[in-house]
């Protein structure tokens, strides 16, 4: 029987933070930010968002070779604030892993002295932690496939 090779997907970061928006504000959350987006929201923060000829897009002139990690990138005030999640020039900074490896990394960021196994239901406090897929655009077919693989793992 031939061993099937698990497909790899690009992501920009996996991190743990507190949810800051909506009904679940304040909930501890593991995040995976996928790479790729079919939207390029260049009008954000522009003086005239209706006129693309006037757009100032700092990410276009940024020297990507000046950083080694996504975490070291600046947050741009104009255009898409997460353009690094879709602009091809930043692809070399992205993680490229199988869903199984991504799932393991998600569990690892949940591990603490009181949650040694990285469970989404904290064993002591019984506090639920969430998993949020973000982007880029997690609903693109690559994000959907990776998400399903992570859930299965």
Predicted regions: what they are:
Residues 27-29, 147-148:
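Short amphipathic alpha-helical segment that frequently serves as the phosphate-/nucleotide-binding helix
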Residues 1-28:
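Short, Lys/Arg-rich amphipathic segments at extreme N-termini
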Residues 32:
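Residue-level signal for inorganic ion chemistry
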Residues 2-5, 9-12, 39-153:
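Conserved Radical SAM active-site core
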């Amino acid at each position: 029987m031939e061993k099937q090779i698990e497909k790899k997907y690009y992501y920009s970061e996996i991190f743990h933070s507190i949810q800051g928006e909506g009904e679940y504000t304040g909930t501890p959350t593991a995040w995976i930010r996928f790479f790729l987006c079919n939207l390029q929201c260049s009008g954000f923060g522009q003086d005239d968002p209706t006129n693309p000829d006037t757009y100032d897009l700092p990410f276009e002139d940024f020297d990507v070779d000046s950083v080694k990690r996504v975490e070291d990138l600046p947050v741009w005030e104009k255009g898409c604030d997460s353009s690094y999640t879709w602009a091809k020039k930043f692809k070399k900074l992205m993680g490229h892993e199988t869903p199984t490896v991504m799932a393991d990394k998600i569990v690892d960021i949940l591990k603490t002295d009181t949650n040694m196994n990285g469970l989404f239901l904290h064993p002591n406090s019984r506090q639920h932690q969430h998993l949020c897929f973000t982007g880029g655009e997690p609903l693109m077919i690559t994000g959907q496939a990776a998400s399903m693989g992570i859930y299965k793992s």
